[in-house]
Amino acid sequence: MKNIIYIAIMAMWLMACSHEPEAASIPFSTVTAEKEVTLTADKDAPSCKVTLNVACAKGDQPEIDKNMNQAIVQELFDMEGLSIQQAADSFATRYTQEYKKNLAPLYAQDKSDSEKRAWYEYHYTIDTHTQSGHDGAIVYLADVDYYEGGAHGIKQQIVLNFNAKTGERMTLKDVFVPGYEVRLSELLLEKLMKQANVSSIEELRAKNYLYAIDMYPSDNFILGDDEITFIYNIYEIAPYSVGKTEISLSYSDVEDLLK
């Protein structure tokens, strides 16, 4: 009889544990902001369009949501003390206002040159999504695409990793032991050379990598389930023609450096 009671109690305990919410199960909703303005009142005038789709933490623990959302506002919009909706609306308004203010005088001079019209067709887009990361972390990814004149637009990926239990942003210093920089840079360089199929730094530079900079651990990284992926956007370690560079190291590769 005692065994039956014990088994029943254990079964109830296991069922209760299985219904506890997972750390990385914080729900998100999408905040949107859109704004478009034309440079002049002319029918065929160039325009600037801002489209922002930003994931916002909407869990049942306000302090965790606040920590995450404040970090998102700071990183994506360089603002403080605003909700994500307020920051997105403010950014869209300010961006389009500055577009008209700064470019209207220039366009007045170039208006007669049809070949230059495309230079004034601006856009700024942010799309975001989240995914579960290593050891219950929440990985927040923002894809930014903008054009502000010139030969081509710019695409960037911005990553934030959050401790799901606190909502605090996780940095490299939270992941690695003090003094990690030198060895981690060496591992990243080795992996980059392998990806580029070269055996020397000279060959790597011949492929336009690290032409005027030494290898370094990017603070733009993804704490994946099985590996850490370091993101280097265009112009950070290579020119536009090379594009975004991703370097992934397994946790076993950096085992001695992990906290």
What name fits each language-model region?
Residues 2-8:
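Sec-dependent signal peptide recognition
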Residues 18-259:
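Compositionally biased intrinsically disordered regions enriched in Thr/Gly
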Residues 9-10, 236:
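Exposed boundary/loop context
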Residues 8-9, 169:
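A ubiquitous, low-specificity "background" feature that marks scattered single residues
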Residues 13-16:
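C-terminal motif of bacterial Sec signal peptides marking the signal peptidase cleavage site
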